[in-house]
């Protein structure tokens, strides 16, 4: 896997404009003529409302027919509202187009959708030809989130010198810029921001905060409180509110009738009391990542490192991919036993080992050899296309290791039918997996990815025994 280290920036730097947003997680490119930017009459004639949604599971996720994304339910209600007010009886259906949050407004400007529903605070001040609707949720504070048992904060000024982990497009960036200006007046150190890997959404960052991999983040209070219900170790510091704004939808300036219709809908719409039942059911008992860099875990990893590195090198893999998989599968326990004969450090099955010519999977060397060869075989046979970047290639390989390569290939085919990017697992093909088989394989790939990112940020100390250290989580 090609490493994509997180970019550490002082928040006094400005974020790129929407027009220059990096296309790191976009779906397949869509070219639409300007004449196809439509108002409500054209939308009704086409019978399709194209909605650009934030690709995060928190915003637009669906698990086996159950909506878990906050925008998903609102949009379903809006679809019902539109069809209830159709004069000619023509029904309109929604087409959701998932994109990274920082790409949504630019996609709307290009005419790739009719409506943007981000599910988070989104600043549209730099976007041309875009209008915000009435508030979806009014007066939303951005609050600090840490983990229970660690230091809490009472005032924003106490964040001086601290680092916040933020997703690309986070509304917290501008709030931190303003906070740093105040800190500078008092000659205090600025708050720093680390932009997390683009494979992570806001819910992933919160999970990594709960695990202690990341220390602090800032998110919208409703999002923090929602996820704290299924991640009880999270601590929401409501007294440290960096800013306050309205969550909104967005339309093109020339879509006057659509804008008016959305505003009328939002004036009366109220979230149902049971809107999070499916969300809590999907996430309550789901696997949660742990902190993988504690002293004992580091010691175990150091003993296994030569074996992991040797076999990773033989298969042209990153040894930290194998380490992350081993932590997820067995917590680095060579004696672990699982179902269906899965054995050892990497929980390889005898049948999978036989496919790559390895007979003994009971000792560490044979187990790692079999698993690395099997992963390499999957990668080579099913996911070798140059259209798949290395990060996504590993994600597909992990999904196939867990679910079977043929099933993952079928999901890619279905993703293409649905207008998703078949060469991108994160936030694209994984949506098909959530629809078909639930959260299991999605959680599996995400967990291994998070362990990889945790290891990768400590790569130098893990690879150089003289630099080994135990990372403090204070």
Question: Which residues does each predicted region cover?
Answer:
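Extended ligand-binding regions for polar small-molecule ligands
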Residues: 24-43, 69-81, 147-173, 223, ...
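Acidic, polar ligand-binding/catalytic clefts
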Residues: 76, 87-158, 222-226, 231-243, ...
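Catalytic and substrate-binding regions of cell-wall glycan-acting enzymes that process beta-1,4-linked
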Residues: 392-459
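Pocket-lining segment of extracytoplasmic ligand-binding domains
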Residues: 121, 146-228, 360-368, 372-384
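Extracytoplasmic small-molecule ligand-binding "clamshell" domains
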Residues: 22-124, 128, 195-200, 220, ...
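Bilobed "Venus flytrap"/periplasmic-binding protein-like clamshell domains
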Residues: 50-59, 64-85, 141-200, 295-307
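Substrate-binding/active-site groove segments that recognize
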Residues: 335-359, 365-377, 423-424, 448
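Export/targeting segments at the very N-terminus of extracytoplasmic proteins
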Residues: 284-331, 365-368, 382-386
């Amino acid at each position: 896997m090609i490493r994509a280290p997180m970019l550490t920036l002082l928040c006094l730097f400005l974020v790129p404009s929407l027009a220059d947003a990096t296309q790191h997680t976009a779906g397949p490119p869509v070219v639409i003529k300007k004449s196809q930017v439509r108002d409500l009459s054209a939308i009704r004639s086409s019978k399709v409302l194209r909605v650009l949604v934030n690709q995060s599971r928190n915003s637009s996720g669906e698990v086996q027919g159950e909506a878990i994304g906050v925008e998903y339910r609102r949009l379903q209600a809006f679809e019902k509202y539109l069809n209830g007010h159709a004069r000619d009886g023509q029904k309109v259906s929604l087409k959701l187009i998932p994109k990274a949050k920082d790409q949504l407004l630019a996609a709307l400007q290009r005419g790739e959708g009719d409506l943007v529903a981000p599910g988070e605070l989104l600043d549209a001040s730099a976007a041309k030809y875009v209008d915000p609707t009435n508030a979806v949720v009014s007066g939303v504070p951005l609050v600090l989130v840490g983990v229970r048992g660690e230091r809490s904060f009472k005032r924003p000024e106490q964040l001086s010198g601290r680092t916040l982990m933020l997703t690309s497009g986070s509304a917290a960036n501008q709030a931190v810029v303003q906070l740093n200006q105040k800190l500078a007046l008092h000659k205090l150190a600025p708050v720093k921001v680390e932009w997390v890997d683009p494979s992570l959404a806001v819910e992933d960052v919160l999970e990594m905060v709960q695990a202690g991999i990341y220390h602090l983040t800032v998110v919208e209070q409703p999002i923090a409180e929602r996820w704290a219900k299924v991640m009880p170790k999270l601590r929401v510091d409501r007294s440290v509110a960096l800013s306050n704004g309205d969550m909104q939808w967005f339309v093109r300036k020339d879509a006057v009738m659509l804008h008016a219709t959305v505003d009328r809908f939002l004036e009366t719409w109220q979230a149902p009391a049971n809107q999070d039942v499916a969300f809590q059911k999907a996430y309550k008992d789901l696997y949660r990542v742990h902190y993988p860099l504690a002293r004992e875990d580091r010691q175990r990893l150091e003993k296994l490192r030569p074996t992991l590195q040797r076999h990773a090198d033989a298969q042209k893999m990153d040894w930290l991919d194998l380490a992350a998989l081993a932590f997820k599968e067995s917590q680095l326990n060579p004696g672990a036993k699982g179902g269906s004969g899965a054995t050892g450090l990497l929980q390889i099955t005898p049948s999978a080992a036989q496919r790559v010519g390895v007979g003994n999977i009971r000792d560490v060397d044979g187990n790692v050899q079999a698993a690395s060869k099997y992963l390499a075989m999957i990668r080579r046979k099913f996911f070798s296309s140059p259209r798949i970047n290395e990060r996504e290639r590993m994600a597909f390989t992990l999904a196939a290791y867990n679910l079977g390569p043929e099933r993952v290939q079928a999901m890619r085919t279905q993703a293409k039918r649905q207008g998703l990017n078949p060469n991108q697992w994160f936030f694209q093909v994984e949506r098909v997996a959530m629809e078909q088989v639930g959260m299991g394989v999605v959680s599996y790939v995400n967990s291994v990815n998070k362990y990889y990112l945790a290891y990768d940020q400590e790569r130098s100390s893990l690879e150089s025994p003289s630099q080994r250290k135990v990372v403090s989580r204070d």
